[in-house]
Amino acid sequence: MFFVTRLRLRARENGFFFSKSLSFSSASVLKSDDVEGEDDAIEAEDRRRSVTDRAYWRRRIHSICAVRRNPDEALRILDGLCLRGYRPDSLNLSSVIHSLCDAGRFDEAHRRFLLFLASGFIPDERTCNVIIARLLYSRSPVSTLGVIHRLIGFKKEFVPSLTNYNRLMNQLCTIYRVIDAHKLVFDMRNRGHLPDVVTFTTLIGGYCEIRELEVAHKVFDEMRVCGIRPNSLTLSVLIGGFLKMRDVETGRKLMKELWEYMKNETDTSMKAAAFANLVDSMCREGYFNDIFEIAENMSLCESVNVEFAYGHMIDSLCRYRRNHGAARIVYIMKSKGLKPRRTSYNAIIHGLCKDGGCMRAYQLLEEGSEFEFFPSEYTYKLLMESLCKELDTGKARNVLELMLRKEGADRTRIYNIYLRGLCVMDNPTEILNVLVSMLQGDCRPDEYTLNTVINGLCKMGRVDDAMKVLDDMMTGKFCAPDAVTLNTVMCGLLAQGRAEEALDVLNRVMPENKIKPGVVAYNAVIRGLFKLHKGDEAMSVFGQLEKASVTADSTTYAIIIDGLCVTNKVDMAKKFWDDVIWPSGRHDAFVYAAFLKGLCQSGYLSDACHFLYDLADSGAIPNVVCYNTVIAECSRSGLKREAYQILEEMRKNGQAPDAVTWRILDKLHDSMDLTVERELISNPATSG
C-alpha cells in the first residue's frame, strides 16, 4: 500500500471525510469567512463523492497542485484514497510531480516518483517521459539517471525520448562525467534510438571540456561515418577544444572550414549559436586579437547577421572584463557605418567604471551623444560615484545634465544619485547649489534628497548648514523631517562635541515632530556620549530608553559595555552585565567581544579568561574574535601557557583558529624552535 503522509480519515456512508491539517500560521488564523466557506463546501463535496468517481478526484488533485500549488495536501488526499482502494493513475502522478518541481522540491520529486514505482503505480510511457523531462530541470543528472534505471527495471519496454537522452548527456558533461554520458549513447542505440547531431555535439563538447581532444576528434569522425552531417555548432565546439589545448593552428584551419559550413547552413539560429560559441571560446582562452581580426574582416562570416555578431563580440569581451577591447569593436563598427546596440554600449561604460576607468567611460559617454545614448540608471550611479571619487565635479555635473535630458527619467532620483556622489567630496557649496538648482527647476526634493544633503554636510563638519536645512524642513519649506533626518543631525552634533544640542533634539525636537525615538536613535546618542567621555549622561539616556518602553538590542549593550570600559568603569560594566545584559537574553558575540576587549585593555586578564570559560559553560557561543582577543592579551603579557589553554578551549567549543590566531601565536613564539612550538600545540597542558 502506498503511504505518503499520515492522514486522519473518517468513513461516511457514501464517501469519506478528510480532516483539515493543523496550521498555526497567522494566515490560517486570519482566514476570511469567504475562504472558510469555500473550503467547507469543497470538504462537503469530498465527503459526498465516492472513491470510484475517478474523474472528480483527477480534477480535485490537479486543482490543488496547479491552482493552489499545495502538493502536500494532494499527497494527503491520495494517501486517503489509497486506503479506500483507489489506485493513482498517470494524471495524478504527473500533477503531484509537477507541483513539487514548481515548488523547487526536486529532491522530493525524485523520491516520490520512486515511491510510486515501488508501490506498483507505473505510469504510461508518455507520462514517464514528461516526468523525466521535468526532473531534468533540477540539474541533478545523477539522481535523474538513477530514476531512469529504476523505471526501466519496473517497465522493461520503456524507452526515454531522444530529447531526454540528449539533455541528460549534456548535464552529465557539465559535471565532467563524460564517460557516463558516452555510455548513454550505447544505451540509446540498444533501445532503438539513433543518435542525432545534438547527441554527438554534446559528447564532443564534453570531451573538449575535460581536454580529451583525441577522443573528441574520434567522436567527430564517428559522427560522419554514421551518416550524420556535423552542423556549424558542432564544428564551433570542436574548435573551442583545440583553442583550450593551445593548438591554434588547427583551430584556425577549422575556422576556415566553419565559415564554409555557415554559408551552406540554412538555420539562422544555428549559425548564430555557432558564432557565439566561437567568440566565447576565444575570450575564455584569451585569443582577443583573433576576435579583432574577425571584427575587421566580417566578410569571412558574412552569413551571420552583422549587428548580432558585433553585439555578441562586445558582450563577450565585457563578460571577460576586456572593456577597452569592447570599445575597440565599437570603433570598428563606426568605421563601417554601424551603430552599437544601446545595451552593449551601456555594458562597456559600466565595465569601465567598475574597473577604475571612469575617465574612459566618460569619453565614451560623450561620444554616445552621436546616436542619442543615455546610460541606465545603475550605470549612471556607478559613473557618478567614480567621477566624484576622482574629485572631478565638472564632468560629474555634465553627466547629471545629460541624464536630466533623458525622456521619462525621474528627475528627483537623478539628483539624489548626484548628491550621494558629492558626499564623497568635501564640497558643501556644490551640495547646496544642487538643492537650489532643484528648486529653480521645479523639481521638489523628497525626504531622501534632504537626508542625503544633511548627511553629507554633517560628514563634512558643516553641522550648522545641516541645522539650517533642518529648520527649513520644520518650518514647512521642505517636507517634514523623519527619524533618519533627526538621527543624522544628532550624530553630526555629537561628532562636534555638542552633546547638549543633540540631547535637545532627542528630548524636544523629536517629540514635537511626533517622532518616537527608536533603538537606533538611542544607540547613536549613547555611542556619541561615550566617545565624549560623558558616561553618566549616556547611562541616563539608557534609562530614558527603558522608560520609553524601547527594547534595547545587542548593539546597545555592546556600546555601553565598550563605553564603560573605555571610561575606566569596569566594575560598573561587570554589574551591568550581571544585572541587565545576561538576564535580558539579548547578547551575542559582539557583546562578548566588547566585554573581553574592555577587560583585557583594563588589565583584568584573569577576569577575561574566567568570563570566556563561563560563557562556554553557560551554553553561549563566543566566536573566534572573542578567543583571539584573550589570546592576544596573553601574548602581550608573555603568558604562553595561558594562550595555549585558550587555544585548546577554543577547539573544544567548536571554533577553528583563523589566520589572526596563528599570527598572534607566531609573534608569541618568534624565537622558539619549531619542534617546541608543535609540541605546545599538540599538548598545551604540558607547556609553560
From Swiss-Prot:
From the UniProt record, list the PPR repeat ranges. 53-88, 89-123, 124-158, 161-195, 196-230, 231-261, 271-305, 306-340, 341-375, 376-406, 411-445, 446-480, 482-517, 518-552, 553-583, 588-622, 623-657
What Gene3D superfamilies does the record point to? Tetratricopeptide repeat domain (1.25.40.10)
PROSITE patterns membership: PPR
Pfam families, per database record: PPR, PPR_1, PPR_2
Keywords, comma-separated and alphabetical: Repeat
Per the record, the domain of life is Eukaryota
The family database entries (InterPro entries) matched by this protein are listed as:
Pentatricopeptide_rpt, PPR_P_subfamily, TPR-like_helical_dom_sf
**Which PANTHER family does the annotation name?**
MITOCHONDRIAL GROUP I INTRON SPLICING FACTOR CCM1, PENTACOTRIPEPTIDE-REPEAT REGION OF PRORP DOMAIN-CONTAINING PROTEIN
Q: What is the similarity comment for this entry? A: Belongs to the PPR family. P subfamily.
Q: Under what name is this protein listed?
A: Pentatricopeptide repeat-containing protein At3g18020
Origin organism is Arabidopsis thaliana
